[in-house]
A protein has these predicted regions:
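Enzymes that bind and transform nitrogen-containing heteroaromatic metabolites
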Residues: 1-161
């Protein structure tokens, strides 16, 4: 049985999701949207993403993909591969969200059951990109537009059967 999971990401118009270990913008309300969607779920991330966050995300089970596990803590597990992380996440009765970074998105996007994508209405320099994907493989089910300190739009896609 295939594990059902969603990718969630914020990117600039030019697909940048990071610069070094930082997000190259602050869009008021965007992180609250991320929190609302992922709270209560299981989040899967690469080591660099975990290091940039600096701690496990609260109110979520955190799974970090790394070749060098650091030991487990409450609501925090380490796995050596994407496949192992998805297997572990499937045993936890919660929605599963892949939250980055670029390499992890690239390895999981083709089998995602849903995408939660926020596009910040700016072009920025960076070194971590959200991968291109076949939009015809997904149905767009929701779009929301926001204007705070920056304009951004949220799109929710589900995979076609």
């Amino acid at each position: 049985m295939k594990t059902s999971y969603a990718l969630i990401a914020a990117m600039s118009r030019n697909r940048i999701i990071g610069r070094g270990d930082d997000i190259p913008w602050v869009a008021k309300g965007e992180q609250a949207l991320f929190k609302k969607i992922t709270s209560g779920g299981t989040v899967i991330m690469g080591r660099k993403t975990f290091d940039s966050i600096g701690r496990p995300l609260p109110k979520r089970h955190n799974i970090v993909i790394t070749r060098q596990p650091r030991g487990d803590a409450d609501q925090l597990d380490f796995c050596g591969s994407v496949e192992a992380a998805l297997e572990l996440a499937a045993t936890i009765a919660r929605p599963i969200f892949v939250i980055g970074g670029g390499e992890i998105y690239a390895r999981t996007i083709d089998h995602a059951s849903a995408l939660h994508l926020t596009t910040i209405d700016i072009d920025v320099e960076g070194d971590v990109y959200f991968p291109t994907f076949d939009e015809t493989a997904f149905n767009l089910v929701d779009t929301q537009h926001f204007e705070t300190n920056l304009k951004y739009s949220y799109r929710h896609y589900t995979a076609k059967s």
